[in-house]
Amino acid sequence: MDDRTVVVTGGTRGIGRAVVTAFADAGATVVFCGRDRAAVEDVAEITGAIGVRADVRDEFDVERLMETAAREGDGEIELVVANAAVNHGTPGKMPIAEEPYSRFDDTMRTNVRGIFTTIVEALPHLASDGRVLVPSGSIAREAKPNMGTYAISKAGSEAVVRAFATDIEQPVCIVDPGLVATELTGVDTARDPEDVAPMFVWAATEATEDEINGEIVDLRTWKKATR
């Protein structure tokens, strides 16, 4: 991946950080963002990737992120991983009827509009053979009690993926790594983010466009293709 430029939003923790590390280790030019400047600087120092403090709720931040990535690479971006997301509250303890308007609005602005913004701002720089990957999970498709706005936002983000997959030339897909131990899921007994990061590398490099465009790439799909 020495000649490829990869952008990862939400790259300072969890899956995002693991994906930044995986692509940097593969030789790609990786540009990532996060809200916390200190965390961005820490990940950049550890991985050798290029960190930008940016908030996906702000389209001007995202525009600057994509311009930085194009400038640092070969003028184009070959891969975008639209990973940034929030989950306000404790999973399983967020009855939707009790969700504050402010929490609903911020979750949707980050997890749905943030995906939209990331793809829109990437498009002027996205290579003709570029790809967009968006992490999601079964919570977007299978209702579970007390998951609050997070579940709704994930369903919304998948709808955004399907719309772009239909409308643009480059493939856009959902990557569902199953339950992963992150701050968003609130569990620490699931898969480690580092164990699922190779899914993203496979979807970016080995999977065919027909295999991924508008599709959900889950663990079964990945393991079947790589065993």
Go through each PLM region and give its residues.
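Conserved glycine-rich cofactor-binding loop
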Residues: 12-13
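Conserved glycine-rich Rossmann-like NAD(P)H-binding loop of the short-chain dehydrogenase/reductase
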Residues: 26-42
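The beta1-alpha1 cofactor-binding region of Rossmann-like NAD(H)/NADP(H)-dependent oxidoreductases
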Residues: 38, 53-67
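Amphipathic alpha-helical dimer-interface segment in Rossmann-like NAD(P)H-dependent oxidoreductases
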Residues: 67-71, 108-130, 166, 205
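Conserved mid-core segment of classical short-chain dehydrogenase/reductases
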Residues: 87-105, 146
